[in-house]
Amino acid sequence: MVTAIVLIDVEADRIPEAAQQIADLPGVDQVYSCAGDVDLVAITRVADHEAIAELVPGHISKVPGVLRTVTHIAFREYSQRDEDDAFSIGMQS
């Protein structure tokens, strides 16, 4: 499984529609609109690098209003849930 974080610049008047279209794409797990340097952040989870190579330029970049994407590939996931699981070994709930 490959997780990628895709930063997306979108024409201002098309952000809601673009966000929904991107969210509906297979492999896109979450889409956030945000303040800052980019308009949308998409969290993607796909089978392999070939799939992310298809998803971003082949689908996300072609959504009407999308101007630019920057993709970051995740190496490892660190989350509170992982920490909680690690420290609860042998403890009863």
Regions found by a protein language model. Name each.
Residues 1-93:
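A compositional/biophysical signature of low hydrophobicity enriched in polar/charged and small residues
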